[in-house]
């Protein structure tokens, strides 16, 4: 059985036991999150907007890979290099 969930305007197709990286959530490490399910997929049956929730356990808060932002204006000796690392939360789906 699979479920379609939405966290921070991003959709994820999850099963029990899946580990995902989602944008930073305000939940303590080791705590649980209740996420509303958008759809439940069970073989050939698909139920939209079920009254079920997905329970996920927070494994940790980490930073994503670095994204390099480079700006340059030709013939003007202007160069700017900046890096950005987005904060992410690692979660594990406990139950559907």
From Swiss-Prot:
Residues annotated as transmembrane: none
Compositional bias annotation for Polar residues: 85-96
GO BP field: translation
A Pfam family the protein falls into: Ribosomal_L21p
Keywords on record: Ribonucleoprotein, Ribosomal protein, RNA-binding, rRNA-binding
Record has Ribonucleoprotein as a keyword: yes
Disordered: region residues: 73-96
Comp. bias intervals (Basic residues): 73-84
Top-rank taxon, per record: Bacteria
GO molecular function: rRNA binding; structural constituent of ribosome
GO cellular component terms listed in the entry, alphabetical order: cytoplasm; ribonucleoprotein complex; ribosome
Keyword rRNA-binding: yes
Subunit structure: Part of the 50S ribosomal subunit. Contacts protein L20.
Function as written in the Swiss-Prot or TrEMBL entry: This protein binds to 23S rRNA in the presence of protein L20.
Similarity comment: Belongs to the bacterial ribosomal protein bL21 family.
NCBIfam families, per database record: L21 (TIGR00061)
Protein name (record): Large ribosomal subunit protein bL21
